[in-house]
Amino acid sequence: QHERGIERPQRVCGDQLAIFEVGSTLYLLLSDGMGTGEPAHREAAMTVRLLREFLEAGIEPVSALRTLNAALMLRGEEGGGFTTIDLLALQRPTGAGTLYKYGAAPSYLKRGGCVTRVTGQSLPAGLQQGADGPESTRLSLQAGSFFVMVSDGVADETDDEWLQNLMAGWSG
C-alpha cells in the first residue's frame, strides 16, 4: 500500500516456515508467496500445508515438489499465484541432506570458518515449465556446522557479503 510515495507496513507476512520430521528425515521448509500482504500469505501458507501433507504421506520430495508446481501452474491460469520454495531434507542419523529450490533466495552453509552460498536458477513454483526443477544440491551437515535459509529482501546474490561475513565470524 502506498500513500504519497510512502510505503505502509504490511500486517501480514508472505513468508511461511515449517519444520517437521517424517521417519528419520527432518524437513525445513521456507516458502515466500509472491506479492505482499494477505495474497502472498495465502499462497505461501497453502504451499507449506500441501507440501507437508505430501511428504508426510510418504511422497518423495522431487515428486511432491513437481506435483505442487503443476498444481500452482493450473491455479496461475485461474488467477492464482506462485511461490518460492526452499526445502531441506536432512537425514538425522548422518547429517546428509538435499536442498531443493524453486526460485528461492540463496541459502548458506557454514562449516568451520567457511561459508558456502547455495543458489539456484529455477523459477518459482507455479512458473517453472514442464518437468524441470526443482534444483537440488546435496549437503553434509556435521557437528558444528549450520545452515541458513532466507527469503528475498534479506539478501540476494549481489548483496550478501555482509551476511556471509556475519556468519563466518559467528561461532555459536
PLM features: residue spans?
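Short, surface-exposed beta-strand-loop junctions and turns on beta-sheet-rich folds
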Residues: 34-36, 104-107, 114-116, 155-156
